[in-house]
Structure formats: structure tokens, C-alpha cells
Amino acid sequence: MSSGGLLLLLGLLTLCAELTPVSSRKRHPDCDKPPDTKICQTVVRAFYYKPSAKRCVQFRYGGCNGNGNHFKSDHLCRCECLEYR
């Protein structure tokens, strides 16, 4: 991995750590909503949290702004939706 890639990864991990309180935290309520797969604009790769699998899953997001359970990366999805104990 290039040094630029490592710096980006370090920055994302730092951001996730800063946004995650040290104490126990529950996931955002939008993380329990189903993915919005309607097509309104350009289709892009996105991730949503799948509660039954307890993980983030890739899907095709059509830009309809349906709910808050869509993220640009798996990392951002995990930061927002995984429970920390």
C-alpha cells in the first residue's frame, strides 16, 4: 500500500475513533431500516447495515435519499451502525 493510502486509512480510523465514545453506544435507529433500492439518479455502490447479519452489506444505491441507512464505504457504515460495548 502506498504512503498516501496508509495516511488515508489512518485518518479514517482516527475519525472513527473520535466519533465513537469510550462508553457503550447503541447504533443509530436508521441502521435498522431496509436499504432504499429505488432508482432516482445515478446508481452507485453503497453499503447498508443488515441487522439480521450484524454487518454492513454492499448494495446499489439509486440516490433517492430514502433513509439514513446508506453509506459511501463499509468503514463508515461500521462506524455508525455497529454496537460497541
UniProtKB/Swiss-Prot annotation:
Coiled coil: none
Tissue specificity note: Expressed by the venom gland.
GO molecular function, one term: potassium channel regulator activity
Disulfide bonds: C31-C81, C40-C64, C56-C77
Listed InterPro entries: Kunitz_BPTI, Kunitz_BPTI_sf, Prtase_inh_Kunz-CS, TFPI/VKTCI-like
Signal sequence interval, chain numbering: 1-24
Entry-linked PROSITE patterns: BPTI_KUNITZ_1, BPTI_KUNITZ_2
One GO CC annotation: extracellular space
Primary subcellular site in the record, as a coarse category: secreted
Residue ranges of domain BPTI/Kunitz inhibitor in the record: 31-81
This protein's UniProt keywords: Disulfide bond, Ion channel impairing toxin, Neurotoxin, Potassium channel impairing toxin, Presynaptic neurotoxin, Secreted, Signal, Toxin, Voltage-gated potassium channel impairing toxin
Keyword Secreted: yes
Gene3D superfamilies found in the cross-reference section: Pancreatic trypsin inhibitor Kunitz domain
Location(s), subcellular: Secreted
Functional description taken from the UniProt entry: Beta-2-bungarotoxin is a presynaptic neurotoxin of the venom. The B chain is homologous to venom basic protease inhibitors but has no protease inhibitor activity and blocks voltage-gated potassium channels (Kv).
Family according to the record: Belongs to the venom Kunitz-type family.
Subunit structure: Heterodimer; disulfide-linked. The A chains have phospholipase A2 activity and the B chains show homology with the basic protease inhibitors.
Entry protein name: Kunitz-type serine protease inhibitor homolog beta-bungarotoxin B2 chain
